[in-house]
C-alpha cells in the first residue's frame, strides 16, 4: 500500500510537517483564528468517537431493560460499579499518553510514540488482572452495602462476562491516544462508528434471539471493543511510523513503562477522583427521606451533564494534542495560543449549552421521565445544572491543557482539595443540615468544580511556556538511546 490511498499519513510527511512547525509565524501569541479552526476540526470528530464508545454500554443497558425490571436493576448497578472500579481507572491511566506521545510527536521522535504506546498496553493489561478479580467477587461487595441478594448475584454475573470488555478497553484506550496525539482523528472516527453500528444488531442478536440475556449484553460490549481495536490495528499497520519504529528493544519498552507509570498515576487521580465524586453524589441521595425521587432527579441531571461532557471533553482532547505537539516542537507561543483558543471555544460551548438548557428548563426533563413531580424538581435544579455545565466546559478544556503540558500532579492535588475537602463536605451540610436535599448535593459538587477550575486557570495563566518547552525536551531526551545522544 506504499503508493495507494492511506488514512494514516506516512512518516516522511509527518517529519516535514513538524520540521516546518518550528519555523511557523509566532505572532498569534494569545488567540489565533487558524488555531481555533484546527482545534474545532479535531474536536468535532472526537465528539463522535467519544459518543460512540459511551453509547456501547448505554445500548446494552437499554437491551437489558427490555428483558425485565430485575435485569435492568442488576445491569445498572453493575455498570456503575464496573465504571468506578475499572473503566474509569483505565481511561485515566491511558491519559498519560496524551503528554508523552503528543510531545514526542511534536519533537519528531516517532520511535518514542511506539515505545510509549506499547508500554502503555502492557501496563494497562497488567492492571486489568486485579480489577477482574474484584469483579469476580462483585456479589460479596454488593452484599456489604446491603443490596438485594438476587440483584447482587445477577450484577456479579454481568460483571464477570464484562471482563473481556475490560481487556479490550485497555488496548483500545492506548491505541486511541496513539492516533489522537498525532491528530489522526479519521481512523478513530471510522473505527468507532463501525464498532457502534456492529454493536446494535449484535447485542440484539445475543440478548433476544440467542436468549443469552444479560450475559449477551455484556459479551456484545467486549466484542465491540475488540472489533474497534482490530479496525484501529489495521489502520496502524498502514502507517510508516508503525513499520519503521515498532521493532523495539526490551530496554526501550521498560524505560517507556517507567515514564508512563510516573505520569499515569496522577492522570488517573485527576480523572477518577472527579468521576467518583459524582457517583458518591448518587449514593448520598439514597440516604434522603424520599430517596426514589432524589436519586431519579440527580441521575437525570448527571446524565445530562455527562452527555455534555462528551462534547466539551473532545475540545479538551484537541487542546491536549495541539499543546503537547507545540511544546514538543519547541514552540511556546503556539502552545499558549492553542491553550487560549481551546479555552475560548470552551467559553462558547458553555454559553450555548447553558442558555439553551435554561430556556427549556420546564420541558427537557420529560425526555427522561413522564412524572410531573420529577420534572418539577428537575426544573428547580436546572439553574445550578446550567452553572455546573458552564464550569465543566472550562474545566474539561483546562484539564486537556494540563494533560498536554504534563501538569497531572497539580490536577490531582486540586481534585482532592476541591471535591473531597471542600465540595463534598459543603454538599453534605447543605443537603442534610440546611435541608436543601438533592439541590444541596449538586451545589456542593458545583463548588468543587469551580474551585478546581480556578486552580487550573491560575496555573495556565501564570505558566512560563518557555520553561514548559524545556521540560518537554527533557522528557523526550530521556527516551532517546544514549549511543545516539
Curated annotation (Swiss-Prot):
GO terms for cellular component: membrane. The chain crosses the membrane at residues 41-61, 74-94, 118-138, 159-179, 188-208, 212-232, 263-283, 297-317, 338-358, 381-401, 414-434, 442-462. Residues 1-26 are annotated as: Disordered. GO terms for molecular function: antiporter activity; xenobiotic transmembrane transporter activity. The keyword Protease does not apply. Pfam families: MatE. Signal peptide: none annotated. It is found in: Membrane. Keywords: Membrane, Transmembrane, Transmembrane helix, Transport. Belongs to the multi antimicrobial extrusion (MATE) (TC 2.A.66.1) family. This is Protein DETOXIFICATION 8. The lineage of its organism: Eukaryota, Viridiplantae, Streptophyta, Embryophyta, Tracheophyta. The gene is DTX8.
